[in-house]
Amino acid sequence: MADQLTEEQIAEFKEAFSLFDKDGDGTITTKELGTVMRSLGQNPTEAELQDMINEVDADGNGTIDFPEFLTMMARKMKDTDSEEEIREAFRVFDKDGNGFISAAELRHVMTNLGEKLTDEEVDEMIREADIDGDGQVNYEEFVTMMMSK
């Protein structure tokens, strides 16, 4: 499962993992898991967290090592990219419902999520996803971006 992650994703997960592995012993506690997941843009419920922990905490000691964490994140990412969830996410960003995400709409949603981005950062995000170069993101471009993350 974890072998389907890109090197960039693995590096991101390692960075997040080590931020919460306070004593550097290579494991994180179950309490810290929710914080790690949220830092990576996931938003699991308490029940989902408990399920994930139970699935990967093989020895039942309440801690998760990095290989277990990678497996869990790979599973979680695969699950969250269903077409219906991507469509819902697109609708959240496409405030006026015109089928496009503008820089203003992107900035609005990111600000509501607590991400304070500069205009340059927002423009860069649009540029990265904007395949046809029209300055906004349509549904196909959004799907492509979501599937490649």
Curated annotation (Swiss-Prot):
Q: Does the keyword Acetylation apply?
A: yes
Misc. remarks from the entry:
This protein has four functional calcium-binding sites.
Stored SMART domains: EFh
Q: Which CDD domains match?
A: EFh
Q: Which family does it belong to?
A: Belongs to the calmodulin family.
Q: Which residues bind Ca(2+) 2?
A: 57, 59, 61, 63, 68
Q: Which residues bind Ca(2+) 4?
A: 130, 132, 134, 136, 141
The protein, known as: Calmodulin
N-acetylalanine modifications at? 2
- GO MF: calcium ion binding
| Keywords of the record | Acetylation, Calcium, Metal-binding, Methylation, Repeat
What is the stated purpose of this protein? Calmodulin mediates the control of a large number of enzymes, ion channels and other proteins by Ca(2+). Among the enzymes to be stimulated by the calmodulin-Ca(2+) complex are a number of protein kinases and phosphatases.
The EF-hand domain covers: 8-43, 44-79, 81-116, 117-149
Q: Which GO terms describe its cellular component?
A: myosin II complex
